[in-house]
Amino acid sequence: MAIPLPLTSCSPISTSSSISRTSFVPLTLRNRTFFSNQNYSRRVLISCSSSLSSDNGSSPDSMNGNGNGNGSSLNGQSSFPRLPSFDGTSKPPLKWRRVLLKVSGEALAGDEEQNIDPKVTMAIAREVAAVTRLGIEVAIVVGGGNIFRGSTWAGCSGLDRSSADYIGMLATVMNAIFLQATMESIGIPTRVQTAFRMSEVAEPYIRRRAIRHLEKGRVVIFAAGTGNPFFTTDTAAALRCAEINAEVVLKATNVDGVFDDDPKRNPNARLLDSLTYQEVTSKDLSVMDMTAITLCQENNIPVVVFNLSEPGNIAKAIKGERVGTLIGGTWNSIVTTTS
C-alpha cells in the first residue's frame, strides 16, 4: 500500500543511459533537515529508478531481484543512491536551538519620552528575524518598567504592593502587544501569551501550546510576568525558560554586562567576562533578583547579560557568540557562528 508523502515541490531532473533512467525528485518535508552536518534547505533527493530494455531484451524483476539489469532488489544491492541516515533529530551546528530573550522595560524606552521607542522594537524585530531564519526558536519575556514599576509605586496614595504589581503586569502586556505588532509588520509570525486571561488581546499561557508555536517557527512573547504579585519579570523569564525547555536566558539591558562596581559611579569599573552563580549571590551583584538566579542555578540554565543598544548584539547573543557577561557557564563551550 503506497503511503503518500507531504510533497511541497516535485520537479524531476532526469538522467538516462542504455540501462536505466533515474529521476531525482527534490522532496521538501516540513520542519525537517535531512543532513546531520549541513543545512540543505530541508530537501532530500529521492531516486526513482526504472529499468529500460537492454541489448538482450531482458528486464529485471524489481521485487525479487531476478534479471540481469541494475534494478532495485529486495534481496541484493539497490541502485538507489545511499542517503545519510536521518533520525529526525539532526540539527545545524548552532550552540542553542531554543532561547529565551528577556527585554527590560527600560531598554524598550530608549531615548523616547513616550515610554516605548519604535526604533528599539524594530531593531529587536530585525535581529530576531535574522536568527529565526537559521532555525533557532525564540521566546521573549518583556518587562514593564518603562510604563509602571509596582515596587516603586507600592505604598503611594494608599496603593498596596499587590495592586501595584498587577498594574505592572498590565504594563508588560502593553509592551508585548507593541512588540508583536512590530514583528508581524516585517513578516515574523508572533504570538503573545499572558499569565492571566485576556482573551480579547492575547492567548492564555499554556505550556504545550507555547512549545508548539516555537516548533512551528513562531516567536512567542510571554507577558504579565508570572501572574502573581511579588515576583519580578526576571523570575518570570527564568520560570518560562525552565518550563519550555529553553537552553539559556539572554537578558538584554541598557548596560554592557555585569561590572565589578557601578560604572556610573566608578569610571574604572571592570566588565566581568563570566561568573558563577555562587559569585553572583555572594557578591550581591545586581544581575537578577535572587529568586531568578536560584531558579536558573537549580535548573542549570546559563544567563547572558548584554547591551541591547549595541547593533547586532541580540543576534550574537542568540547565536551563542561571545557578548556581555556569561553566568553559570564557560565561554569555551560557546560556538561562534558567522551565519
Curated annotation (Swiss-Prot):
GO terms for cellular component: chloroplast; chloroplast stroma. It is found in: Plastid, Chloroplast stroma. This is Uridylate kinase PUMPKIN, chloroplastic. InterPro entries: AceGlu_kinase-like_sf, Asp/Glu/Uridylate_kinase, Uridylate_kinase_bac. It comes from Arabidopsis thaliana. Induction: Induced by light, detected at low levels in etiolated seedlings. It comes from the Eukaryota. Disruption phenotype: Reduced capacity to grow photoautotrophically associated with low levels of many plastid transcripts (e.g. PSI (PsaA, PsaF), PSII (D1, CP43, CP47), Cytochrome b(6)f (Cytb(6)), ATP synthase (AtpC), LHCs (LHCa3, LHCb2), and NDH (NdhH)) but abnormal accumulation of others, altered plastid translation as well as a strongly affected plastid ultrastructure (e.g. almost absent stromal lamellae and swollen grana stacks) with a large number of plastoglobuli and reduced photosynthetic performance due to strong defects in the major complexes of the thylakoid membrane. Belongs to the UMP kinase family. Its EC number is 2.7.4.22. Pathway: Pyrimidine metabolism; CTP biosynthesis via de novo pathway; UDP from UMP (UMPK route): step 1/1. It is an enzyme of class 2 (transferase). GO terms for molecular function: ATP binding; RNA binding; sequence-specific mRNA binding; UMP kinase activity. ATP binds at residues 102-105, 145, 149, 180-184, 189-191, 253, 259, 262. Expressed exclusively in leaves, but not in roots. Residues 52-79 have a biased composition (Low complexity). It holds the Pfam family AA_kinase.
